């Protein structure tokens, strides 16, 4: 199995970035009798929920861009005309008109449910990526963990958690095994398609969330 190595976006720098973003999901305890605003840094307003979500998505997108760069530099996968062959074997989440995330027919709650459900569906594909970047393992791991934090942020924002569909663990395990059993070319193409689709999904999500 080939591995990718990152130069422009080093693993150490990416991991340090993760440490800066993840604490937002787990704020430091506030002493009894004190309000969190009272212990905030002077002259700095604490980030709102929407600002944290926006920042988290942009951080993940930076990580995806770094991994995609390595994928594209390694081979011609980003230019391949045979993408459809591999893409037909995947069921990557995509935005559709019925999801209420586009400007036409925008519906905040319907869209939010779609975003969370889509991110949950992407998790098995992000797990697959952990075995595709041996020399950039920390970057791939950071994207995966940051996505989990993003899901937590969004679940707190959602009003109808019952409408969110959670993927079946057994089905995910079977899918992961199937993806890992592909030949080398298909594994490389799958990696490219996952990163590209995840980037597009997050970009669409970011535009929609900025309307909420």
From Swiss-Prot:
One of its GO terms (molecular function) is identical protein binding. The keyword Phosphoprotein applies. It comes from the Eukaryota. The modification Phosphoserine is found at residue 81. Its main location: secreted. N- and O-glycosylated. GO terms for biological process: acute-phase response; cell surface receptor signaling pathway via JAK-STAT; cell surface receptor signaling pathway via STAT; cellular response to hydrogen peroxide; cellular response to lipopolysaccharide; cellular response to virus; cytokine-mediated signaling pathway; defense response to Gram-negative bacterium. Glycans are attached at residue 73. Changing residue 173 to V: Almost no loss of activity. Keywords: Acute phase, Cytokine, Disulfide bond, Glycoprotein, Growth factor, Phosphoprotein, Secreted, Signal. Component of a hexamer of two molecules each of IL6, IL6R and IL6ST; first binds to IL6R to associate with the signaling subunit IL6ST. Interacts with IL6R (via the N-terminal ectodomain); this interaction may be affected by IL6R-binding with SORL1, hence decreasing IL6 cis signaling. Interacts with SORL1 (via the N-terminal ectodomain); this interaction leads to IL6 internalization and lysosomal degradation. May form a trimeric complex with the soluble SORL1 ectodomain and soluble IL6R receptor; this interaction might stabilize circulating IL6, hence promoting IL6 trans signaling. Cytokine with a wide variety of biological functions in immunity, tissue regeneration, and metabolism. Binds to IL6R, then the complex associates to the signaling subunit IL6ST/gp130 to trigger the intracellular IL6-signaling pathway. The interaction with the membrane-bound IL6R and IL6ST stimulates 'classic signaling', whereas the binding of IL6 and soluble IL6R to IL6ST stimulates 'trans-signaling'. Alternatively, 'cluster signaling' occurs when membrane-bound IL6:IL6R complexes on transmitter cells activate IL6ST receptors on neighboring receiver cells. IL6 is a potent inducer of the acute phase response. Rapid production of IL6 contributes to host defense during infection and tissue injury, but excessive IL6 synthesis is involved in disease pathology. In the innate immune response, is synthesized by myeloid cells, such as macrophages and dendritic cells, upon recognition of pathogens through toll-like receptors (TLRs) at the site of infection or tissue injury. In the adaptive immune response, is required for the differentiation of B cells into immunoglobulin-secreting cells. This is Interleukin-6. It comes from Homo sapiens. The lineage of its organism: Eukaryota, Metazoa, Chordata, Craniata, Vertebrata. The gene is IL6.
């Amino acid at each position: 199995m080939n591995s990718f190595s990152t130069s422009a976006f080093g693993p150490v720098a990416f991991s340090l970035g993760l440490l800066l973003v993840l604490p937002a999901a787990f704020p430091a305890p506030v002493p009894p009798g004190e309000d969190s605003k009272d212990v905030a840094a002077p002259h700095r307003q604490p980030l709102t929920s929407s600002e944290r979500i926006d920042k988290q998505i942009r951080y993940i997108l930076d990580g995806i861009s770094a991994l995609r760069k390595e994928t594209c530099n390694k081979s011609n996968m980003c230019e391949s005309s045979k993408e459809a062959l591999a893409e037909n074997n995947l069921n990557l989440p995509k935005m559709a008109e019925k999801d209420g995330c586009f400007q036409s027919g925008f519906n905040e709650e319907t869209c939010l449910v779609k975003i969370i459900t889509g991110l949950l569906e992407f998790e098995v594909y992000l797990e697959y990526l952990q075995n595709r970047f041996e020399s950039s393992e920390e970057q791939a791991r950071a994207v995966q963990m940051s996505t989990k934090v993003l899901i937590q942020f969004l679940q707190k924002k959602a009003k109808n958690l019952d409408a969110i569909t959670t993927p079946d663990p057994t089905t995910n395990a079977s899918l992961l095994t199937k993806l890992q059993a592909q030949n080398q070319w298909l594994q490389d193409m799958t990696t490219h398609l996952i990163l590209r689709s995840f980037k597009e999904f997050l970009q669409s999500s970011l535009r929609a969330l900025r309307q909420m």
